[in-house]
Amino acid sequence: MRKIILSFAACLALAAYGQKPVQDTRAMDTFIDQLMGKMTLDEKIGQLNLSGGGVPGILSGSEGADETIRRGWLGATGGSELETFRKLQEIAVKESRLGIPLLFGLDVIHGYHTIFPIPLALSCSWDTTLIEQSARIAAIEASSNGVTWTYSPMVDIARDARWGRIAEGSGEDPWWGGKIAAAMVRGYQGDDLTKENTILSCLKHFALYGASEAGRDYNTVDMSRIKMFNEYFPPYKAAVEAGCATVMSSFNLVEAIPATGNRWLLTDLLRDQWGFDGFVVSDYNSIGEMTNHGLGDTQTVSALALHAGLDMDMMTNGYITTLKKSLEEGRVSQADIDQACRRVLEAKYKLGLFEDPYRYLDADRAKKNTFTDKHMNTARHIAGKSIVLLKNDKGLLPLRKTGTIAVVGPLADKKVELFGTWCGIDTAKSASVVQAVKEMVGNKARVIFAKGCNLTNEPMLAKASGLKVDPVENTRLVKEAVEQVKDADRIIAVMGEPNNWSGEACSRADISLPESQKELLRALLETGKPVVLVLANGRPLTLEWEDSQFSAIVEAWHGGSAAARGLVDVLFGDVNPSGKLTTTFPRSVGQIPLYYNAKKTGRPMNPDDHFTSKYLDITNDPLYPFGYGLSYTTFSYGDLQLDKTSVQGENGVLTASVQVTNTGKLEGEEVVQLYIGDPAASISRPMKELKNFQKISLKPGESRKVSFTITPEDLKFYNSALEYIWEPGLFNIYVGTNSRDVKSAQVTWNK
């Protein structure tokens, strides 16, 4: 096996530090200095190229990719096949001049082979341990199958449910988004990147991608810096502080300059202010798309991106085809190219690829570590913890395992549709909801199934998702379902979105359930039988009619490989739901963007005053607020107690406490949430902001005092000069079960 010839000193360093050679950056620097001293300009530029094949106009055809690697013109590529990775790595190591190994990247967003709930659902667990565990398992499986680099976590703050990629993020709150971002980075990268079960993480999409205008993917973004720093940047910064190895630029504009070519964003902020020391990769063809933004031809935008601090070009082939010419013309410098090349080589070094290029390419390890029963059991547990109980007015849930249970709906007998966006799908160990219900009740109850309706009969939506429109069939299906459920004691109606209605390029202007599904729901209500409405979806939906009609509503999201079994664990009470929403559910799409931590208005809503901030046809408040979620038991909150009403100085500490009691008949978990409001500051501040929470478990009748420690760090924000400070004054402290239903008290904090 051909490897790069290491210097004697570098070899000693690698041996001395065993699995942690990067502990001594001098050894890494020495190694890379010597390697780059041997590299030609073409080979250096080649390290900056992430492509799936040959180079247009130079190498093409079936042998294009192989020859590109032999010439040293490829630094990374994508894919998901272990055998292919092995073949390509052997070409890179054995047949290229210097034997530099490749990186293999893949969108491992919420699992590799064992698929966990979509990230939006994961965030509703309010459990960073489980979230980190899901990323750890994803890294174990991906690394066992040749993947060295995941394009995750996506940490974009999203306040617009029309945007399909809201499914890939952690909701609307910057503080909680930051905690999740750090947990995902830890899960992927572990505590030592040289271990064979770790992979490079990639923070994305930097920056502001979740603020696309009108919720339309790839659309423009226009935002003040003060809003960026206070409301959108915290999760990105948290991922950097957690040590994310790479960053992906976003498609959108940032201050009228594409993020991919924005030096203030990629260098001044990311590197100089935040201290990021990894490499930055473009999103798919986002260098080329700068031409569509109006910034010039491929050569011009490629030079602009490199100068901005964009190290690797994904799929544009702009760097590999134009940077050499740009260097000759003085558009880029040799230092720019060398710096980008060094950053890519450092990532490979930190992974241990120069020591063993095949460390991720072990078929036996792939077989042993992939899609195991242990991983599936964990996925089932996490799926159950991610479910949010939206309504249970008449105690219909949990269901009894007796009588006749009808499972109805266009998603009731599906598996693939429950996995969610961005995932490889293997249904071998998965179940449909019908199958999972049958497994749960065994011979204790009879289970019947009816499809009931089409997913949609709306022409554009059906065409976009490969469905046919047939209103006549829908009417027939509804009638058949009504006939089939006539002997049922209870009905489980599984409605929502298939997996290809959310994710990239899946924006929806109407986020209600399609009329075809509502036709079935109306017919089921007319039977007079108890109906549990189960929602499988990748975004918040508008559910005002459903909320007014159904006694029990369960938000199951797209739950991954174990979606159905995790769901029935909740439906039948094996798991008491404890999930809480991390994104606001609007009453109408016309309220969007709608989020809990909004700014004040000069004319707060007053229903008796016409000239105040409100709608004529709907209330301002959401249907379900941020932090909302019910349990099969009930909890009561005592008054909020502060240990003092006045606090002094930087070192001051305030303790806020509340007594929480389980007033129901079942043991359950409650997410006790702390919010702080700053009613008078140098700039207008949000009405309240999440600052902490505790997830507690209480037995029936048990009571516990829950306390939060508050310091000036919890009061800080970016002021008009973008200084991260806290200001003295009066503060509102809130503790409660969600962002709307809280206990409150006030404290004065003096300098």
Please tell me what each predicted stretch does:
Residues 1-23:
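Bacterial Sec-dependent N-terminal signal peptides
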Residues 16-719, 725-741, 748-751:
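Glycoside hydrolase catalytic-domain context in secreted enzymes
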